[in-house]
């Protein structure tokens, strides 16, 4: 969902947003991106089998449904195919696409794999997830859209961050949201992480403090976005922009209220309740991409 949303956010016009070059650039980027996601999540499961037997026993490797050997073949094949597709086409293999793929592969590898295994260190683990969810995915695929679909053949990730406010702000928003999800993910996993000596913030500080801190941070983020776009809607003379900004504002405020309401019935010490809430945040994460093209 992120890739189409960022292509439409970068579009200079409604006609360009639904043109053949745009749709082609989207599809070409989505295939290696899905393969890279398979590599990163698969590698994490391969290296966390013993922990997952405690925290997430239903995952395929932990449950014995997929052998470690077959899993390794799958993730390595996904990595090679993903990176190969990134450079296979002279036009669609943009700098933005390759930054997204290589950056995700690098951070995903050192996050899970020894001797680095950055997930053992709270600050470094959070940095990896924020970097991928924020700058790498958003700015890189925005740059890919500009280069592959909208004629800015020399578009770079840093250039788009510096030149396009929508690119910078979307990267900032999803970077903060990514931080919330990264830290909230560890709250229901405290028992297994403590046994494996993975000192997440939830293990160090306590699941209750992390849960409430992340709930507050995310609700403030949504309310700030809602207020900002409401002000933008009131100050523009364009009917179209006012409508887009109003819809973005209402969506953000409703999402912020949802973050607070759903948290009221959650016991931070109950791993199942926290996991359900964590999955609710993922729904809001992807719904935010659904609204993103309106954020102008």
Regions found by a protein language model. Give the residues of each.
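Multi-pass alpha-helical membrane architecture of UbiA-family
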Residues: 1-296
């Amino acid at each position: 969902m992120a890739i189409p949303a960022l292509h439409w956010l970068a579009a200079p016009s409604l006609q360009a947003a639904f043109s053949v070059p745009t749709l082609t650039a989207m599809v070409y980027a989505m295939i290696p991106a899905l393969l890279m996601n398979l590599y990163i999540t698969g590698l994490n499961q391969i290296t966390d089998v013993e922990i997952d037997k405690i925290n997430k026993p239903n995952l395929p490797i932990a449950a014995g449904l997929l052998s470690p050997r077959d899993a390794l073949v799958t993730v390595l094949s996904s990595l090679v195919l993903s990176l190969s597709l990134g450079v296979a086409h002279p036009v669609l293999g943009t700098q933005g696409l390759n930054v997204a793929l290589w950056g995700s592969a690098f951070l995903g590898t050192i996050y899970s794999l020894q001797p680095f295994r950055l997930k053992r260190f709270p600050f470094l683990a959070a940095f990896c997830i924020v970097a991928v969810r924020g700058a790498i995915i958003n700015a890189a695929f925005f740059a890919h859209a500009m280069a592959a679909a909208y004629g800015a053949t020399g578009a770079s990730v840093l250039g788009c961050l510096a030149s396009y406010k929508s690119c910078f702000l979307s990267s900032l928003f999803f970077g903060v949201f990514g931080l919330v999800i990264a830290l909230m993910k560890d709250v229901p996993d405290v028992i297994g992480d403590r046994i494996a000596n993975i000192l997440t913030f939830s293990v160090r500080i306590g699941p209750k403090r992390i849960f409430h801190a992340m709930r507050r941070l995310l609700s403030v983020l949504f309310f700030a976005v809602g207020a900002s776009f409401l002000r933008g809607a009131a100050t523009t003379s364009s009917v179209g922009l006012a409508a887009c900004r109003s819809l973005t504002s209402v969506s953000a405020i409703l999402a912020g209220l949802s973050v607070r309401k759903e948290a009221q019935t959650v016991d931070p010490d109950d791993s199942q309740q926290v996991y359900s809430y964590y999955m609710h945040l993922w729904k809001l994460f992807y719904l935010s991409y659904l609204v993103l093209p309106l954020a102008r």
